Amino acid sequence: MDDDLKKKTQETANRLFGKGIKMAPSYLTWKEFDRDLANEFSLFITGRLYSRTVLTLPERQMVACAMLAALRATDELRLHVNAALNVGCDAKKLAEVFFQLATYAGMPAVNEALHVFRDVLKERGEWPIK
């Protein structure tokens, strides 16, 4: 395995998820079925894709949160809302990202995203948004 890629993957993961990473349940599930494939996905997604510099990590996380909210993928959304806040996304802007979904993903998706967002903010001691 390329040591530079492995190092970049770990550094990016630490920025997104903090030390003592709580991996997404989907990653753990993949790992149960095929450890090598799960690791390859991790290297590609975190080490290569998330390490690109065209978008900042906060911008990437806002995109990820919007997509996950539209898909109503709440477990992954919870993980990426935390990551967004970890890399400096403004909570008011992230709320606005979720409001914008109403037109394209519908109110149920917005409501679900806001519930996840509020729960994460409460867990972090950052609720209500100031």
Q: Which residues make up each language-model segment?
A:
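Acidic, glycine/proline-rich low-complexity segments that act as flexible tails and inter-domain linkers
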Residues: M1-L57, E112-K130
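Alpha-helical transition-metal enzyme core signature, strongest for iron centers
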Residues: K6, A70, L101-A105
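N-terminal alpha-helical segment
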Residues: S42, E59-R60, L77, L94
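Short, structured motif recognition centered on aromatic/hydrophobic residues
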Residues: R60-L68, F98
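Short, solvent-exposed interaction modules
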Residues: L68-L71, N86
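Short helix-capping/linker segments at secondary-structure and domain boundaries
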Residues: L71-R78, A109-N111
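C-terminal binding/interaction regions
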Residues: L85, C89-K130
